Amino acid sequence: MAEEYVPVDPINITPASSKSWLDVDLDTYIASLPPNVTGVAIRVLNASSGGCPAGVRKDGSTDARTTNVTSGQMCFFCGVSSSKIFEIYSGSTTYITAYIVGYFKDVTFLTNATDVSSAKAGVWNDLDSGYNNAIGLILETNIASLKSFDFGFRKNGSTDNRTERGVRRCGCFIIGADAGVSEQYISSTDQDTYLVGYITENATFYTNATDISLGSTGSYADLSVGSASAKANLIEVVASSTYDFGLRRNGASDDLYEGAAKHACILVGADSSGVSEGKIANTVVDFFLLGYFLAAAGAVALAGQIATKSGLAAGTS
């Protein structure tokens, strides 16, 4: 089988209880999943004005990164078990909402993430995953304290220099790699990075990201296309202040519109022409196209939401 990312329009999986790890079964929410599903993409929104605990992990993992996530929205990526189960943690049923926005087939996810934190602050450093065949790395940021630090990720050899502040944890990033090597920047060694998984095919990662920022506010507008064949677009969100933004498949009706976490990475579905839409509350919110995901050879590219099962909640592990 071949690696592939399959986007879906958002499916609400907000936990009904808080402060414990809960099992989520993908088969409960998405019909007719193939047996080679290995991971999931989750959009997490924190509507509080401050931090709130949240986290996701592969079923069976002992990882327990549940420190406060930033106010705003972000993406998390994690593996699923052979039964297509992952686990989610929420510190609040009032402020935290979570949505499945896609799943991965045959992509490698680690049961327990590997610490790939940098020992040097204030400079760009190589981040060697140890997987020479990787063209993209799936990384999770983690700040153990309630402080804010500048950080950034880029493909090895890039001259990009986006090191906007991360206010507490900012979810996961997917970044291009050259023979398994990316680069990271931190302003403090209190900022940790964990390797969650890696990608080897059917994705394109730019060496230098393309600026696809919007010039108008308040309504959804088409974003510049990286490829008409793209099934999903990988977008880095950078903002000098906290303003709302939304990203969705072109033609979709969902409206996950929440504050920019100053620095986030969103994997968003595209229509049959590779187009996604964005909305911003202020032009200080910028979008950068890091790359895009393609259908596996012989696969049928579907624009729009696949068959889902609605009205169901996550169960307690």
Predicted regions span which residues?
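Short, surface-exposed beta-strand/strand-loop-strand elements in extracellular ectodomains
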Residues: 47-64, 144-161, 240-255
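Beta-sandwich interaction modules
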Residues: 68-82, 164-178, 258-271, 309
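A short beta-strand element within beta-rich, extracytoplasmic domains
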Residues: 35-47, 133-144, 230-239, 317
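Surface-exposed ligand/attachment interfaces on beta-rich extracellular proteins
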Residues: 8-36, 48-49, 111-132, 206-229, ...
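Surface-exposed loop/edge segments in extracytoplasmic proteins
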Residues: 6, 60-68, 110-112, 158-165, ...
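Extracellular polysaccharide-targeting segments
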Residues: 101-111, 197-212, 293-297
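Noncatalytic modules at the cell exterior or secretory-pathway interfaces
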Residues: 40, 78-94, 137, 174-190, ...
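Edge beta-strands of jelly-roll/beta-sandwich modules across compartments, strongly enriched
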Residues: 51-54, 93-103, 188-199, 282-293
